[in-house]
């Protein structure tokens, strides 16, 4: 019974430092097995998804050395298998990156179908389309993707839908294909660019990452590198929303402001004060915040991973807001939980109508996925009384030391694993 318990009502105030980007790290770690040389990766977030992926890399036969909590050295010279069997991988969406990495380097891969948060069907058909276009035979066999190729040959590939995962996966495989691959209608998210930059630091020839068209000239081999992962855009945005939700004053450090422009713009539209510095952003929530509308879109649009957090902020704003989710079809599952705290939200298909209320009341809620779990925690910190959030394993997949960082901002929150500990918390806090 691991859960967060908190007593809300305190504005969050202070400074918090963003960890490395989990979504970039997942792709970069998979790509690290594409060379026989040492690869040193810094600014790695210490979260459960990353640790599970490192375990899987080790099980393939690579040597994995944790230099410190946020730095790892990987040497894949002695990889002895192209089959990912680790059961933990079935719980991680990004396990599919092993397909592109193994196929690119060894021309063969067998990887369990991905798991992760249940926020939509999220098919991998675009990944498979890309691998087949590069000359690989791809089948789904007993719950796993099985891919084999005699040689990978460059191709001109147009993605039918913009997909971050497919963009990264095909890009990795094409890195060691013969000739120049052209990828069109690709994702432009910061972590796509970061994975491309990492591959280039190992000797890949990738141009255009961050634009609509990526060109990849295949190379015969990749070499070792030292690389530092970019800051986490979504973690930074979560703490920015925390300032709005709790009417606080938070400076988020170790950020790239350009990656946060859509979030900053919407918080400003709500009436928050947003001040950008070179590597910091300060957000000051206001007693009265305005309603506004937003729609999730691929980058540089508003990120779907920030939709629950921003919706919580709007649920406490004046007036009626409209939230349109255009990326995943099941991303409003947290609304029923938020309603237990007093939110007034009606969901009609891919649209949520949010009527702002003056305050939330503490309740026992359950996190349905990673980002919704974080949003429910922030709602609890703004609520009157005590809130417990169950299924926090989702949250810990993507946020490093979440409750510790919140406590540093003045939150009254603890992670407990029994009702007895929860009761002690209530008695101590009063």
Predicted features along the sequence, with ranges:
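Short, structured segments at the rim of ligand-binding sites
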Residues: 1-430
């Amino acid at each position: 019974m691991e859960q967060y318990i908190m007593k809300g009502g305190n504005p969050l105030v202070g400074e918090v430092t963003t960890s490395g980007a989990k979504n970039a790290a997942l792709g970069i770690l998979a790509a690290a097995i594409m060379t026989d040389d040492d690869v040193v990766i810094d600014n790695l977030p210490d979260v459960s998804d990353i640790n599970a992926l490192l375990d899987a890399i080790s099980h393939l036969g690579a040597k994995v050395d944790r230099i410190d909590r946020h730095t790892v050295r990987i040497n894949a010279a002695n990889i002895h298998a192209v089959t990912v069997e680790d059961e933990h991988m079935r719980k991680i969406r990004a396990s599919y990156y092993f397909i592109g990495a193994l196929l690119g380097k060894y021309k063969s891969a067998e990887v369990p179908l991905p798991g992760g948060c249940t926020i939509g069907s999220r098919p991998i058909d675009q990944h498979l389309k890309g691998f087949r276009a590069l000359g690989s035979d791809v089948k789904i066999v007993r719950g796993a993707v099985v891919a084999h190729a005699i040689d990978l040959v460059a191709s001109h590939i147009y993605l039918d839908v913009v997909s971050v995962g497919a963009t990264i996966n095909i890009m990795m495989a094409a890195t060691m294909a013969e000739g120049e691959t052209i990828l069109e209608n690709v994702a432009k998210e910061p972590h796509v660019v970061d994975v491309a930059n990492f591959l280039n630091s190992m000797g890949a020839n990738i141009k255009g990452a961050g634009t609509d068209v990526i060109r990849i000239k295949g190379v015969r081999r990749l070499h070792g590198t030292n690389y530092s992962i970019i800051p986490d855009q979504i973690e930074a945005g979560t703490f920015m929303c925390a300032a709005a939700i709790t009417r606080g004053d938070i400076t988020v450090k170790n950020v790239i402001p350009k990656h946060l422009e859509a979030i900053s713009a919407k918080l400003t539209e709500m009436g928050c004060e947003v001040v950008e510095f070179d590597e910091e952003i300060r957000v000051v929530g206001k007693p009265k915040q305005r309603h506004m509308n937003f729609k999730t879109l691929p980058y540089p649009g508003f990120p779907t991973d920030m939709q629950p957090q921003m919706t919580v902020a709007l649920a406490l704003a004046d007036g009626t807001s409209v939230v349109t989710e255009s990326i995943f079809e099941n991303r409003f599952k947290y609304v029923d939980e938020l309603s237990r705290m007093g939110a007034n939200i009606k969901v009609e298909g891919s649209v949520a109508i949010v009527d702002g209320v003056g305050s939330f009341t503490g309740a026992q809620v359950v996190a349905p996925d990673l980002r919704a779990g974080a949003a429910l925690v922030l709602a609890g910190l703004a609520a009157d009384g005590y809130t417990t959030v169950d299924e926090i394993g989702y949250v810990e997949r993507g946020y490093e030391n979440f409750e510790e960082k919140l406590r540093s901002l003045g939150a009254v929150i603890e992670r407990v694993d029994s009702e007895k500990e929860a009761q002690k918390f209530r008695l101590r806090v009063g």
